[in-house]
């Protein structure tokens, strides 16, 4: 079990019995998977119901930006807040469209 530290907490990442690793030494897909797993647990603490969607939204960003968010609590929380605002706006737009089709 490897551990990554973000926000002064330890996130355990299942990676078999391998020794500690450097993220840059992993293939791109494994990097993305590991970052995604870590992000999911972090987002889940703030917005459990929308963690899968928000995690996906954040993973669409440039990897350097994502890594910055992982180690900057204030920026991370702001990004999750922005993602929730986007989701709320999208939901309202869909509701307006649905109402318009009923008339």
Swiss-Prot record:
Inducing or repressing factors: In vegetative tissues, expression is repressed by MET1. In the endosperm, the maternal MPC allele is activated by DME and the paternal MPC allele is repressed by MET1.
Residue ranges of domain PABC in the record: 15-92
Tissue: Mainly expressed in flower buds and in siliques containing developing seeds.
Protein's UniProt keywords contain Metal-binding: no
Matching SUPFAM superfamilies: PABC (PABP) domain (SSF63570)
BP terms from Gene Ontology: regulation of endosperm development; regulation of translation; seed morphogenesis
Keywords: Translation regulation
SMART domains named in the record: PolyA
Keyword ATP-binding: no
Pfam families: MLLE (PF00658)
Superkingdom, taxonomy of origin: Eukaryota
Entry GO MF terms: RNA binding
InterPro entries referenced in this protein's UniProt entry, alphabetically: PABP-dom (IPR036053), PABP_HYD_C (IPR002004)
Segments passing through the bilayer: none
Subunit structure: Interacts with ERD15/CID1, CID7, CID8 and CID12.
Additional information: The MPC locus is imprinted. Only the maternal inherited allele is expressed in endosperm.
Function of the molecule: Encodes almost entirely the C-terminal domain of poly(A)-binding proteins (PABPs). Plays a role in normal seed development and growth.
Name of the protein this chain belongs to: Maternally expressed PAB C-terminal protein
Record gene name: MPC
């Amino acid at each position: 079990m490897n551990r990554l530290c973000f926000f002064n907490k330890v996130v355990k990442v299942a990676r078999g019995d391998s020794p500690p690793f450097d993220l840059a030494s992993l293939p791109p897909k494994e990097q993305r998977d590991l970052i995604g797993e870590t992000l999911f647990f972090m987002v889940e603490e703030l917005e459990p119901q929308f963690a899968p969607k928000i995690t996906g939204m954040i993973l669409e960003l440039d990897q350097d930006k994502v890594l910055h968010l992982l180690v900057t609590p204030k920026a991370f929380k702001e990004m999750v807040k922005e993602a929730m605002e986007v989701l709320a706006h999208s939901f309202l737009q869909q509701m307006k469209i649905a109402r318009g089709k009923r008339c």
